Amino acid sequence: FTRLLHQSCVRKYYTVYQTLPDGTISSYIIHAGSYKTRPNSVITRYGDRFEYASPQETPALMTDLVDWYNEAETAGKLSAVELATLFHYRYIRIHPFEDGNGRIARLMVNYILARHGLPMLVVRHRYKQQYLDALHQADVRVGFSPSEGAQATLAQIAPFSVFFKKLVATELQYIIAFATETSAKVWWYDGQRIVFRSPSTAILLTAIEENPMITIEQLAQKAGIAPAAVKKQLQQMTLKGYIQRKETDGSLRIFATTSV
């Protein structure tokens, strides 16, 4: 299943280029849906090289992972969050593909949560360092051998489990708040509630949402403010990531959203 998922998520064949420690550039071809054929590793922020499972180990470890998951689902002793947490950690320690492992890990987490009626989970960029720190703390407790990581227990990965549970709780609170908000003045971006200082900001966003090709003059007329003020607000919203202007046609794309 994970290989089929990988095949669906990445291009069938593509080349990856990397710079080696001596400065030379090497390349290799990624085969979608195929397990890795060369070792993979990562340099941690502490400067250490962290090795994942070898290509030789990978098929057997992935078979064990899938067998364990199916048995754990049938047994029903672990909650959906615990299942997703442990699967994610074990999968990451194997890193079975040469590229796209993060995407597959996130998709598998959401697949497990969805099977149990829970909403999809997003690991937002602002939590990335906390995520990496929690993984590192779990790695120290588990041991750095790939086979140890692939057989880790929930108790061993407690730091990562605590982080993951808090993340799920935070996202659920966001979803509930988003679904129950009734004010048109409240917007949302990247899992956070936004209340604008000026009522004209929400008017501008709504107008852009309705017509991505709207002009500065038209926005000024709708919001009842000067064109210069519109330009200033658009600049601020662009810097914060709420909107982005496409280079191809000049239209505006909105990343913030309203509940109503």
What spans do the regions from the language model cover?
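FIC/Doc superfamily catalytic core
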Residues: 1-99, 103-260
